[in-house]
């Protein structure tokens, strides 16, 4: 990994390569002739004025596409899109996280992005942290080019293997804690630790594990207290909910991950985010259900210490690494964990993905009538026939249609649609955004989605139909689909009827909520 400077250093960690058209003062080294020999008619054109300074990164604007070819989308988050990108000069592949400036609606949002870049540069060179190759800013977005972790998410690798042991879980956890111990020793709290944020560098069996997504991370000093509630619901520590926390909150999140690794479900569970938070504050950790009777005393002891409700009494990263269960050649047994654990782990991963897939189906499977109506609406709003709609055209168009939206809702609709942050929305973006503003659980939308999966119109979704539909989206293998059927299939007939489908779709999904700052009343 390349050298980096901590925030505040005057040197750039990743200076942009000089473009082929970069200007050099006449008379500088390598000039073809001295100023005295150049006639006025042959004098070079004056140097271009420097690029304006970007308001987010505070450095000259630069077009990331002049250096990288941006390819297919890899993922989408609250603030932007991650795409595959290729360095034009070397052909090397990276991941490019594009953060739309239109989505950065508050001063805190801008500061979060700026700090994310600073923290990633600060942690550069650490083997367990995804490397930031460069940060670029143009008029519409900030682009973070990072090393590509092509091996996928940690839990997906475990599921694909089909079996694992306490010893393997111990080894994984040791790697995760080593990474976070390094972050803490360098004055960084991650604040959003969860399985999805640990990726494998490649598909190789022994590929290194990398921590990613430092968008909520902060620098900290010893004794400093943080008060904003951030993170992903299942993994948030109780002191975060009480608005008084430090680096110990990361240990809690890893403790939740360990609990899931050992039994397949989160320790704090409810049908809503509010319910999960209350469960976290109660702090009761269940070791009575199976498979805990077959899990070693050492593993349970470490989970208890990591999930201690009092952060002052919680085990530190250093002490976790010295715990007998986690030490290399320690006491973690090599006997396979119960197959039921893997089944539950699959369900925990697959259910979230199935619901996301179904929501995408709802957004993408509009009836011809709806599409025709929305197409006409788009045309009528596009007053200058440019093929795109500005926020002003959107506002006026909605008012003409008698749609009563507040200014904030109009802005929300615009921001939801404008994925590339260029200030306008095209037809496809408009369709997606219009659906986004509707309630996704409306009866007709749910029925449309159900029909999409029910290929033979039998009134049931079978394993084969679900597999076919989800394979089209490249989401799951057959085993995961079987697990989903059994989870949703309330009457145990081996298939999903409409009532069961609706119940699944309307069930609380806390992870669908934004992970950003929350106002929580408990």
From Swiss-Prot:
Question: Lipid moiety-binding region for N-myristoyl glycine?
Answer: 2
**Binding-site residues for Ca(2+) 3, renumbered to this chain:** 454, 456, 458, 460, 465
Keyword Calcium among UniProt keywords: yes
Which parts of the sequence bind Ca(2+) 1? Answer: 382, 384, 386, 388, 393
**What is the membrane topology noted in the UniProt record heading this document?**
Lipid-anchor
Q: How is its activity regulated?
A: Activated by calcium. Autophosphorylation may play an important role in the regulation of the kinase activity.
Reactions listed under catalytic activity: L-seryl-[protein] + ATP = O-phospho-L-seryl-[protein] + ADP + H(+); L-threonyl-[protein] + ATP = O-phospho-L-threonyl-[protein] + ADP + H(+)
Keywords attached to this entry: ATP-binding, Calcium, Kinase, Lipoprotein, Membrane, Metal-binding, Myristate, Nucleotide-binding, Repeat, Serine/threonine-protein kinase, Transferase
Residue ranges annotated for the EF-hand domain, each copy included = 369-404, 405-440, 441-476, 480-511
Q: What class of enzyme is it?
A: transferase
- Ranges for the region named Disordered are 1-58
User: Which residues are listed for Ca(2+) 2 binding in this entry?
Assistant: 418, 420, 422, 424, 429
Q: Which Pfam families match?
A: EF-hand_7, Pkinase
Role description: May play a role in signal transduction pathways that involve calcium as a second messenger.
Name of the protein in its database record? Calcium-dependent protein kinase 14
Organism equals Oryza sativa subsp. japonica
Q: Provide the taxonomic classification.
A: Eukaryota, Viridiplantae, Streptophyta, Embryophyta, Tracheophyta
């Amino acid at each position: 990994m390349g050298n980096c400077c901590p925030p505040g250093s005057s040197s750039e960690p990743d200076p942009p390569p000089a473009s082929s058209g970069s200007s050099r003062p006449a008379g500088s080294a390598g000039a073809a002739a001295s100023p005295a020999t150049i006639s006025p008619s042959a004098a070079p054109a004056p140097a271009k004025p420097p690029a304006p300074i970007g308001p987010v990164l505070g450095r000259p604007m630069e077009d990331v596409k002049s250096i990288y070819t941006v390819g297919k989308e890899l993922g989408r988050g609250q603030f932007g899109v991650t795409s595959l990108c290729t360095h034009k000069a070397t052909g090397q592949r990276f991941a490019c996280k594009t953060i739309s400036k239109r989505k950065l609606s508050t001063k805190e949002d801008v500061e979060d992005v700026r700090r994310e870049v600073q923290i990633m540069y600060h942690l550069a060179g650490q083997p367990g942290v995804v490397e930031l190759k460069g940060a670029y800013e143009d008029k519409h977005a900030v682009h973070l080019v990072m090393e590509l972790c092509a091996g996928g998410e940690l839990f997906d690798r475990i599921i694909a293997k089909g079996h694992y042991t306490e010893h393997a879980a111990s080894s994984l956890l040791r790697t995760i804690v080593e990474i976070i111990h390094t972050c803490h020793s360098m004055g960084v709290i991650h604040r959003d630790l969860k399985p999805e944020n640990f990726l494998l560098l490649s598909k190789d069996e022994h590929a290194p594990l990398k921590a990613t997504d430092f968008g909520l991370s902060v620098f900290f000093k010893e004794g400093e207290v943080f008060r904003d509630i951030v993170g992903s619901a299942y993994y948030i520590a109780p002191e975060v909910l009480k608005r008084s926390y430090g680096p110990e909150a990361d240990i809690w999140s890893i403790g939740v991950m360990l609990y899931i690794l050992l039994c397949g479900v989160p320790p704090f569970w409810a049908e809503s985010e509010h319910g999960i938070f209350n469960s976290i504050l109660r702090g009761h950790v269940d070791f009575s259900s199976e498979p805990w009777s077959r899990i070693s005393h050492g593993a349970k002891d470490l989970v208890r210490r990591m999930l201690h409700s009092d952060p002052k009494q919680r085990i530190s990263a250093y002490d976790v690494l010295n715990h007998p269960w986690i030490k290399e050649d320690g006491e973690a047994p090599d006997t396979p964990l119960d197959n039921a654990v893997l089944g539950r782990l699959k369900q925990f991963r697959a259910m979230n993905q199935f619901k996301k897939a179904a929501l995408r189906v709802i957004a993408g499977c509009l009836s011809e009538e709806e599409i025709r109506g929305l197409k006409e609406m788009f045309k009528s709003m596009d007053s200058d026939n440019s093929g795109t709609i500005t926020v002003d055209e959107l506002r006026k168009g909605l008012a003409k249609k008698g749609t009563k939206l507040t200014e904030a809702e109009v802005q929300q609709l615009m921001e939801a649609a404008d994925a590339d942050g260029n200030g306008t929305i095209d037809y496809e973006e408009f369709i997606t955004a219009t659906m986004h503003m509707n309630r996704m659980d409306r009866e007709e939308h749910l029925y449309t989605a159900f029909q999409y999966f029910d290929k033979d119109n039998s009134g049931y979704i079978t394993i084969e139909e679900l597999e076919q539909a989800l394979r089209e989206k490249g989401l799951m293998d057959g085993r995961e689909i079987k697990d989903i059927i059994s989870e949703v299939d309330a009457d145990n007939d081996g298939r999903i009827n409409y009532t069961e489908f609706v119940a699944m779709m309307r069930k609380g999904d806390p992870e669908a909520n934004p992970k950003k700052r929350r106002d929580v009343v408990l």
